[in-house]
Amino acid sequence: MLKTFSCVAALLTASVFALAQPAAFDPAAKVFRLDGGNVSYVFGVNPRGELQQLYWGGELGSTDAFSQAVPMPAWASFDASYTNTPQEYAGWGAGLFVEPALKATFADGNRDLVLHYESHTATADGFDVVLKDIERKIYATLHYAIDPESGILARSATIENREPQPVTIEQAAAAAWALPSGHYTLNYLTGRWAGEWTLTQEPLHPGARVIESRRGSTGHQANPWFAIQAGAPDEDHGEVWFGALAWSGSWRITVERDQLDAVRITGGFNPFDFGYVLHPGERLETPVFYGGYSAHGLGGASRLLDHFELAHILPRRIGTGESAAPKPRPVIFNSWEATEFNVNEAGQMALADKAAALGVDRFVMDDGWFGQRKDDHAGLGDWTVNPQKFPHGLKPLIDKVHALRMDFGLWVEPEMVNPDSDLYRKHPDWVLNFPGRPRSEQRNQLVLNLARPDVRAYVLGFLDKLLTENDIAFLKWDYNRNWSEPGWDQLPPAEQKKVYVEFTRNLYAILAELERRHPKVEIESCSGGGGRVDLGILKYADEVWPSDNTDPFDRLTQQDGFSYAYTPQVMMAWVTDSPHWLNLRATSLTYRMLSSMQGSLGIGANIAKWNEEEMATAKRLIAAYHQVQPTIVQGDLYRLISPLNGSEFSATQTVNRDRSQSVVFLFIHSTQEGRLFPRLKLKGLDPAAEYTLTSIEGKAMEGTPAAASGAWWMNHGLDMDMNFRGDFKAAAFRLDRK
């Protein structure tokens, strides 16, 4: 039986859709259908000419079809049919009271905008559908594509002005989505610096929930991802609709439950302080808004998104074909906690010796190597090697690192400048500012206006020179403040708000050009931790820095939240010193290692002070990690026990795609009343296959079989040794199919 998504269209028995192709159009009913990955998405043109959503959910049958869309009726005289009808891309006009997709002001002051279907073209994996205002020559081309494996849709819009006068776009969503009336739980991610990735779950009440960043970048406080589950939250069961916006500037997602209990979701550029002037013939391209559906709970949704990101979002470097997943990340050492700004040739070489002894793959020198960079008060913008610290340049250090069989990475912060720098003294007009107004500093730095062509050329130029002159494999690209005074006085006053779009476009353009010129160089997106993580930056960045907070217990909850939206492949997780600088919490090296081994592993501790036992422990666990890393970062992730809500325990499991290997991590936060770790029933294994159990760290209960069927491990489960108790304890096991 079809779900109520199709309540405004009658079901027909005659099929006009050929399901061998991902996209089909019924010209008689004016209905579009997209199929992929056990998902169907259907929309059509109603008799008024509006583009109306009809269905989004599990895949429909090959003989199922829809009649022409029927608009929703009005509700008394206060809510017209126009506002009640779930439009694919509604203009703000004709009495629309829900969130519009597009809002504009014309040269004569008119602000009414009603978009009707004009035409469409089929593409390889979807449609381009053209809408036009009922009178004015403003066009919105909606781009639809569906992934045949996951059923995840990619939607965006191109706004074009064919009027004889300029039009100001005041709001432009990438897409609008709709769900029928029902009881739902909204899931989204919130946080702050050093406290990112908090999974927030709440009933979807009447009204609007706005999730946004006004900061000029993605932000720590919210992330452009959502998941809406029918009914109560459930990891393994129930329908989930989810989405992620690919934009690294100011953004907004609005989730509304309207007066008739229907749900609308819009997302795109943040309309706060937004105004993009389109001159005749000009276009505005929105970001891409990805949306997906799972019938298998939040776990099923996140696994779909993980594999979609690996297959279609992350960069393809040399040696990795489009059909192959990106390679697992190198295990890195980063110098920051060991030396902070006090870097020099001899000290970094000594750290490189220690890192190589651990089995590290990549040595990364952090802040302090350039200009007059003794602390965070000076030097940003002057990207030349400090001759006092590195009298022979970077080459001797890089050669040393290569001789130790590691590659070399370097920290940069290209979009920032210190007022105490040669660059700022020469070009004070290059920063975001309003002339004559104070310039607000954060961390003693200002933001370069990357929207300016001269700033874009400078940033690309110095990075290209740095990478051309040095054998650098990796850049840790940082961004340590948000915007203030977002002026751009090169443009007329009415057009200066274009800075919100052009800054981010130029960031992407620089990254794309660097990839073209230096295709082997990999990038990490860092912004004081997780302040710039989204599917836009991940088109160019191979990994991200989730948080400056590396406390291993805090990271369990952060990594849990992160995993709902992003693959563990990109989640860098460092082992740092104990007690931790933020919480003063003391934990064992084993606990810290296992916490970080759930993602892409890094060492950020001051290893110059490690004793032989610590070196041996880290070396052993790094070697064990290398053996199972592809399963951990590219497999199916199952969150077996959540670390949230005061849980004493937590556990995760990953299973590789052919179900030949699985890795399990178990953590005790704080044992209470002598309770033992609960029996852990595993998931995702082949029930008919036999799996051997091998300890990476810790012991199973005496009598646990050395090998058993997948059915045993999933139905009976794994019991831990009676002595697995205490505070901040960790264990890990691998299972290998015989």
List the predicted regions and their residue ranges.
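Polysaccharide-binding surfaces and accessory modules of carbohydrate-active proteins
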Residues: 22-34, 41, 51-256, 272-274, ...
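Conserved, mostly hydrophobic/aromatic
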Residues: 38, 157, 281, 363, ...
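Carbohydrate-binding surface patches
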Residues: 38, 226, 643-687
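Short Pro-Gly-centered flexible turn/kink motifs
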Residues: 104, 112-117, 276-295, 728-735
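Aromatic-lined carbohydrate-binding/catalytic grooves of carbohydrate-active enzymes
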Residues: 324-461, 474
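Active-site neighborhood of glycoside hydrolase catalytic domains
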Residues: 391-393, 425-427, 431-590, 600, ...
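C-terminal beta-sandwich/jelly-roll accessory domains of carbohydrate-active enzymes
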Residues: 670-738
